[in-house]
């Protein structure tokens, strides 16, 4: 039996790849769209370069309990691909390292987004990850799809 899970997601967003890519590497944008419903996010550190690191926490709005995680950027191909790791804070007792890979491809109506997350600890149900990512991707779409020129 596997001790980790892999999930894969696919969306098409009505936004250019450049804007979606930026939303993953801009601290204010990342903290706005990544936390799933019911959580706020805080980026404590973000050095978006290969080998650079980030630290972030999610806070449950109801209970005010926070959990932190962070990792390193493994691959950054502007407007096309990025890959980063995530390790949960030790207090959560969720061992191992997750790896998230995002591939962006321009299509006639926007950008195709493929996300693969590997190494999800067995204690986290895959369906909970899918739900969280679906909520996050809805928030990402709301951030990157509007064409605000001013």
Predicted ranges, named:
Residues 42-87:
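Glycine-rich portal/gate segments that line the openings of hydrophobic small-molecule binding cavities
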Residues 20, 30, 54, 73, ...:
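Hydrophobic pocket/interface hotspot
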Residues 25, 137-145:
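Short amphipathic alpha-helical signal-transduction/dimerization elements
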Residues 83-134:
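Beta-strand/loop substructures that line and gate deep hydrophobic ligand-binding cavities in soluble
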């Amino acid at each position: 039996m596997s001790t980790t899970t892999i999930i894969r997601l696919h969306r098409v967003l009505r936004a250019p790849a450049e804007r979606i890519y930026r939303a993953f590497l801009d601290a204010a944008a990342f903290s706005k769209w990544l936390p799933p419903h019911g959580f706020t996010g805080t980026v404590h550190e973000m050095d978006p370069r290969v080998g650079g690191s980030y630290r972030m926490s999610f806070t449950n709005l109801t209970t005010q309990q926070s959990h932190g995680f962070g990792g390193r950027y493994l691959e950054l191909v502007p407007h096309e691909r990025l890959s980063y790791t995530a390790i949960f804070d030790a207090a959560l007792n969720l061992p191992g390292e997750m790896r998230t890979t995002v591939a962006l491809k321009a299509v006639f109506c926007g950008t195709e987004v493929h996300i693969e997350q590997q190494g999800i600890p067995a204690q986290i149900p895959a369906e909970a990850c899918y739900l969280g990512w679906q909520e996050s991707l809805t928030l990402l779409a709301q951030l990157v799809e509007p064409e605000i020129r001013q």
